[in-house]
């Protein structure tokens, strides 16, 4: 019997501190803080006007003070109930009014929303990139605005300027090569075609064109004798008279 009593006392001596530390103290702290939170609407005016709190009044109350505190609680309960009733009545009236008279769908666009537009764009791009990475998709490049036509540079001219040793005269000469196939002195005399390589099998009845076309003779201008500039041909075409044209036709027929 003595052993049983000793074992019970030993267990109680070990269990009671554990119960107090693990259960009683946390539970008391939770209840006390919950009570302070609930009594906050009463403690604020008491602290502002009387310099005390509800816990001090309860701890130091007498019979008279108890009735005073009880009266305060009654007023508090009545005011809460009265305010709740007023809120319910006005809420019901507003609900009936809105059901009868439709409320227009009008909203006010605040100006401060445009300040967050860049942040919203960045967040949308970041979220889209994260979703694409998680799905294993390739991230599409962000579309860039088209450049202004005034900022578009000429690629050919830039290529010539980037090459070492290229100057403005070289660029002008290279560009002009596409405009005039050949350059000859202005005082160069016009040469007639006496080469036998020309296969001109024309008759007198066929219309003869005294002006040689560069697109009809592929190898006609390969020698120095038969080389003629397009500019001189154009001048001859403008200045030649009918008699000159007849003489040229006769010379060409004799050369055959």
UniProtKB/Swiss-Prot annotation:
Extracellular side: 43-75
Modified residues (Phosphothreonine): 180, 184
Membrane topology qualifier: Multi-pass membrane protein
GO cellular component term of the entry, any: endoplasmic reticulum membrane
Record flagged with keyword Transmembrane helix: yes
Miscellaneous note of the record: Present with 149 molecules/cell in log phase SD medium.
Role this protein plays: May be involved in protein-linked oligosaccharide phosphorylation since the deletion reduces the negative charge of the cell surface.
Name of the protein this chain belongs to: Protein LDB16
Source species: Saccharomyces cerevisiae (strain ATCC 204508 / S288c)
Origin organism lineage: Eukaryota, Fungi, Dikarya, Ascomycota, Saccharomycotina
Gene (name only): LDB16
């Amino acid at each position: 019997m003595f052993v049983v009593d000793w074992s019970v006392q030993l267990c109680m001596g070990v269990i009671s501190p554990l119960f107090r530390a693990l259960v009683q103290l946390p539970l008391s702290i939770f209840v006390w803080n919950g009570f302070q939170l609930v009594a906050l609407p009463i403690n604020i005016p008491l602290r502002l006007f009387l310099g005390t709190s509800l816990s001090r009044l309860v701890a130091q109350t007498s019979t008279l003070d108890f009735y005073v505190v009880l009266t305060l609680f009654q007023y508090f309960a009545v005011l809460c109930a009265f305010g709740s009733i007023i809120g319910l009545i006005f809420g019901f009236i507003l609900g009936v009014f809105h059901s009868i008279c439709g409320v227009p769908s009008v909203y006010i666009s605040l100006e401060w929303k445009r300040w967050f537009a860049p942040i919203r764009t960045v967040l949308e791009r970041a979220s889209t990139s994260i979703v694409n990475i998680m799905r294993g998709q390739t991230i599409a490049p962000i579309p860039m605005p088209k450049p202004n036509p005034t900022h578009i540079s000429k690629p050919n001219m830039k290529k010539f300027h980037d090459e070492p040793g290229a100057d403005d005269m070289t660029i002008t000469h290279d560009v002009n090569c596409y405009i005039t196939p050949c350059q000859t002195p202005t005082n160069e005399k016009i040469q007639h075609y006496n080469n036998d390589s020309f296969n001109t099998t024309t008759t007198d009845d066929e219309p003869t064109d005294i002006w040689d076309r560069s697109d009809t003779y592929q190898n006609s201008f390969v020698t120095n004798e038969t080389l003629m500039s397009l500019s001189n041909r154009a001048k001859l075409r403008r200045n030649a008279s009918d008699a000159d044209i007849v003489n040229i036709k006769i010379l060409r027929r004799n050369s055959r």
